[in-house]
Every structure is written in C-alpha cells, then in structure tokens.
Amino acid sequence: MAVFTEVSFDEAAAFLRFLNLGQLQNIKGAAGGIENTNYFVDTDQGQYVLTLFERLTFEQLPFYLHLMKHLATRGIPVPDPVADAKGNILHRLKGKPAAVVNKLRGHSELAPTPLHCAGVGEMLARLHLAGLDYERQQPNLRGLAWWNETVPVVLPYLTEEQRSLILGELAYQNHIAASSGYRSLPRGAIHADLFRDNVMFENGQLTGFFDFYFAGCDTFLYDIGICLNDWCIDLESGRLDTTRADAFMAAYQTVRPLTAQERTLLPALQRAGAFRFWLSRLWDFHLPRDAAMLKPHDPGHFERVLRERLAHPYLL
C-alpha cells in the first residue's frame, strides 16, 4: 500500500457518507505496497480500507472486485467491496477508480510457523476451487507477456551477471510456457500476490486474504510457487525451509491434490514466481513513480530467491 493521490479528511468523509458508511472519525495513509493509494478509514459504523487505483482501469477493475464478492459468497474470508445505493462496487474519487472494503480482523504473521503455512496452503486450495465457476476472465497482467515487454526496459540497469541470469530465465520460462505439460496444468482465478503481509491471523487462526489487485487467470501452480517463495523461506538468504514448505503443500493437497504434471513442474513455477517479483521490483526501483509514503522493495531479495530456486529445487 502507498499514497500516490492525496485525499483530505473532508473529501474522504463526503465519499464515505455517499456510501452510507457513517461519519468519518479517522483517516490514515498506508505506507506499505507500491501500486495503489490506500487509506485506513474509521467511521462510527466500522473500519474500512479506501483504495484509489493508480494503474488499473475502470475496464479492468470489475474482475478483481467481483472476484472478491464471488469468493466471499463461497465462504472464503476476503474483503467485501462496499456497494452504493445503486449496487455499484466500483466508484470514482478525485478522478480515479476507487473502492472501499471492510478491514479484516487480526494482524499479519511476518514470522510464520509450519502451522501458519499449513493454514495458508489449505485456504489457498479452497480459494482455487471456489473460483472455478467465476465467469469473468482476465489474464495475469504481470505474466509472461509483461515479462517479455519489461526485461528489455530494465536491462540497462543490470550488471553483466544479472543480465545473463534474467535473459536465461526469461528464455527458460518462455520454453516452459510453450510446452504441452504446461498447457495441461489446472488453472483459474489466482491471487498472484499472497505474501505474508496479505494474510491476516487472529489468535493463531487465519482470518482472511486481501489485496487481490494482482489477481488474474493463470495456473494454480504459479500461485503455489509465489506462496512457497515467501511463506516458506529464510528472508535473509532466500533459502527454502522444507519443514514449512512440506506443511504448506500437505495442507493444500488435503483440499486439492496436485496432478502428476503439477508435481513435475513445481520447481519451474517456483522459479517463475521468483522471476516475476525480481523483475517487477527492478522496474519499480529503477523507474519509480512519485508518491507520498512510497517505499520501493529491494530487488536483490528476489534475485537471491531465484538463485536459490535454481540451485536447490524443491521436489515433491
């Protein structure tokens, strides 16, 4: 979360009254994240998150907001977008697309145990199954096509060694994506950004997934790879903790067992997840946008993760 577009107390208060959410009592800009403008807002009726979308368009956003509605109706704990009197859940504020969702209970678990990882794995599998009948379609906007467009943009900022790594991995991922095995992988709506800070826990129990604004239609295995690369690693080295990874995968497979092809391609899709976030962090770091409270992530972290996945693939 970040603040690119400043919203005053009075502007937020009027917007929340329009949505029948009561009187604004407090508003606070959210410093984490790098994509959208986010404010935590408290009213006399509850606590909410106000988001102004800085890159996603009015045409793209219904996919994300209605996906959250769809998942919520199927028992997945996710933020619920607030509708206006006409039933619209996508709004406009200061000329930008905007949405308000309820704030989930609890806190992020930034030092997860195997038990936390198991909870995330089980809920991710439930999410994948719950989304199978979601009718809206939208590609993963940070997928292979974006990688091929963006690698040439960041190449001038890299060392020779980094260029070799990023070009080699891009070629490998293009090769994997063209294979018959990859095309046979189960797919549907995925979260695509389910990091430790996008999950809430309360008293050890998982209370919700949030920040669905990188979601899209892609392979479930890619979503799994992204989670393993964050929930189940040592953050300093990027090294995988197999105890946490095994707990995550065992819990996931109690709900949706992996196919034989998924088991084979898991190392490749873990590499894909590391590559995606290394590339996007390079892009954000070297080509930043103006924003209050913006804290770009260190690109080096996911470079280390990618190198670890290359050196020590995780096999089921």
UniProtKB/Swiss-Prot annotation:
What gene makes this protein? thrB
Source organism of this protein record: Polaromonas naphthalenivorans (strain CJ2)
Q: Which GO terms describe its molecular function?
A: ATP binding; homoserine kinase activity
* Alphabetical list of PANTHER family matching this protein: AMINOGLYCOSIDE PHOSPHOTRANSFERASE DOMAIN-CONTAINING PROTEIN, AMINOGLYCOSIDE PHOSPHOTRANSFERASE DOMAIN-CONTAINING PROTEIN-RELATED
What is the protein name given in its UniProt record?
Answer: Homoserine kinase
User: Recorded E.C. number(s)?
Assistant: 2.7.1.39
GO biological process per UniProt: threonine biosynthetic process
Q: Which family does it belong to?
A: Belongs to the pseudomonas-type ThrB family.
Hey, which pathway is this one from? Amino-acid biosynthesis; L-threonine biosynthesis; L-threonine from L-aspartate: step 4/5
Q: Which domain of life is it from?
A: Bacteria
Gene3D superfamilies annotated for this entry?
3.90.1200.10, Phosphorylase Kinase, domain 1
